[in-house]
From Swiss-Prot:
It comes from Streptococcus pyogenes serotype M12 (strain MGAS2096). The keyword DNA repair does not apply. InterPro entries: P-loop_NTPase, Shikimate/glucono_kinase, Shikimate_kinase/TSH1. It is found in: Cytoplasm. Monomer. Gene3D superfamilies: P-loop containing nucleotide triphosphate hydrolases. Belongs to the shikimate kinase family. Its cofactor is Mg(2+). Substrate binds at D28, R52, G75, R134. Mg(2+) binds at T14. This is Shikimate kinase. Its EC number is 2.7.1.71. ATP binds at G10, V11, G12, K13, T14, T15, R116, R151.
Length: 163
């Protein structure tokens, strides 16, 4: 069965996936290859709705492949109800990586390499509300929750591989 890594932007899903011995499929990388540009550029040119439509199709394709890999999702994969329904069908294999809001905020604030469109458009207070809304979705879909604040990516990867 395919395992799915879920979590808010900046929590370390992609970083952790690099330490897994299992085959990983990074949705953001797959989408960028498909659209021929960065997700940030696509958001700017086409908007969030167009992006979410593509993201949903990629998720569906990866889940239906059912090839014992790990799907590394983007932070917003839980936004669409259709995606949440797909993820519910993957019951017992959804893994949520969690960090405190302050940890995430600081990571995103200092990440000059990967400027995230949804982070840039909010004040810290509004971003906290956005974070809280998303966490409700993540928590409702997750079968295993791993706190990452005080763990190395290698430690998190070991927990995932043992699950």
């Amino acid at each position: 069965m395919t395992k799915v890594l879920l979590g808010f932007m900046g929590v370390g899903k992609t970083t952790v996936s690099k330490h897994l011995s299992m085959h990983c499929k990074d949705m953001d990388a797959i989408i960028e290859a498909k659209i021929g540009m960065s997700i940030a550029a696509f958001f700017e040119q086409h908007g969030e709705i167009a992006f979410r439509t593509i993201e949903s199709q990629v998720l569906k394709d990866l889940l239906f492949a059912n090839d014992n890999s790990v799907i590394v999702t983007g932070g917003g994969v839980v936004v669409l109800q259709e995606n949440r329904q797909l993820l519910r069908k993957n019951h017992q294999h959804n893994i949520l990586l969690v960090a405190s809001f302050e940890t995430l905020y600081q990571r995103l604030k200092h990440d000059k390499k990967s400027q995230r469109p949804l982070f840039l458009k909010y004040s810290k207070e509004a971003f906290y509300e956005f974070y809280q809304q998303r966490m409700v979705f993540y928590e409702g879909l997750s079968d295993l929750v791993i706190r990452v604040d005080h763990r190395t990516p290698e430690e998190v990867a070991n927990i995932i591989e043992g699950y």
